[in-house]
Amino acid sequence: ITSDEIQQILIKSASDLISLENPNYQYVAARLLLFSLRKSLHHRLWEHPHLKEHVNNCIKLGVYDDEFLNWYDEEEINTMNDMIKHDRDYIFSYAGLRQVIDKYLVQDRSSGQVFETPQFMYLMIAATLFRNYDKEKRLSYVKKYYNAISQHNINIPTPVMAGVRTPLRQFSSCVLVDSDDTLPSIFSSDMAIGRYVAQRAGIGINAGRIRGINSRIRGGEVQHTGVIPFLKKFEATVKCCTQNGVRGGSATVHFPIWHQEIEDIIVLKNNKGTEDNRVRKLDYSIQLSELFYKRFIENKEITLFSPHDVPGLYEAFGTPEFDELYEKYERATSVKKKKIGAQELFLSILKERAETGRIYIMNIDHCNTHSSFKDVVRMSNLCQEITLPTDPLQHIDGAGEIALCILSAINLGALKNKEELENLCDLSVRGLEELIDLQKYPVKAAEISTKARRSLGIGYIGLAHFLAKNKLKYESPDAWKLVDEYTEAFQYYLLKASNQLAVEKGQCEYFNKTKYSDAILPIDTYKKDVDSLVKRKLSYDWSTLRKNIKEQGLRHSTLSAQMPSESSSVVSNETNGIEPPRDY
């Protein structure tokens, strides 16, 4: 038996002993796993190669970006080598280190050979992000960012952790693709989806414009096949790539509740039916507005339409003009329609949601009321935390707008005090800002809009840990007050950081397409019913910030999002996102 086989037996034995009663075995197993990694990589446990030697080796192997040595001189590389704290590898729990090794460290996935340790990964990410900063200050930012991510104060998502430092430059977690009701648009959207799925992105698809089954085409020459055949095409594209072995492709498709085929759409994931009338490997988001909630409460009917038969209705969805136009089409005798009880339809949606767990609800009017954009938001992303404007493609290299969002999160569970948020928010914004120009864009419509809007999504992980640390429960008024205080600081410091970057680099090109350009801030648009739950005054100087934003602008169109962080939070040994803990 080899020493490596003995080590693997020890790792498994220690991991099998992890329990609620004996949680510290997670660190025993992690250390054994770490020593196995170091031995296979460096052939020793305690000594590590110099950063330059490590980088040269990885460049020769083709797993690191070969431009790195052009960015930094030898003196800077020596300084960065001294920054690395390899003992921080001991911070990992077993699950966290296992996740890092399996998903994030650069490696040959066919042979299983890993080429870096976690601390080299973190340092290379920080060095790559701040490569374009002035030479006098960039190493200071590299050190601060390295310290923040290696100590798990800032959480970075899968595309960033797996991709920054490598030749594959695609770091957006969220890609939103909007399809029109034409074959060129549907096929162009499908190609765009394929290109981004292959590069680690999660996909949001808007198919709400596609006309319903048996609709007339070319004056009745052809009857439409409906949405399901096109969803099958999207499904095949999403699932044909395993995203470089990092994660499988996934997508959420969006439809308005008034779509003609909604009754067939909401059952697409269940286990009844046949392969011909089910599309189970996609998730679905059903879009509602206040009108439909009123119909539900009053036990009235909802009228279903094919979007093609009601010109302008889809474009009005999510705006104040929708209700009047919708009721006008309900009265029109010449328009093909179908009526269904609102309560019957709602209960069907809730039943499928309860049984499959992957049918989401998107309140489209609420999203537009509270968004930072003047443009209408028509869809969300894979995990439903992002609301960005989109415009359908008509050709893969043509006009349109594919929305991209790069994510990160502040680890609330690791915070010692609220004042730490200022530095962490600034570092998060600056780091993600650099990725927008570093990454490559496989579709032109994504590059144009992303560089013009510069959308970021920075959120929380570890909220449950944070509350537990403060001896508070989710349902406690004291918890609401504390979260309100921290979230005010969080929003304030994100906006302050973006405003400072606007001073340094200029406001984003589409700043005037945001509500921020009219000095409308999150403190103006949040749902005021919150004030009945948390009675306190604002703590920060919002009036000065408002003035600065009005005069100097922001570098980003939007800054915050509460992503689920299901896999990346495991690395930090934290509860995911803002979610409460689930049963053991």
Feature annotation, model-predicted:
Residues 1-584:
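Extended catalytic cores of very large enzyme megasubunits
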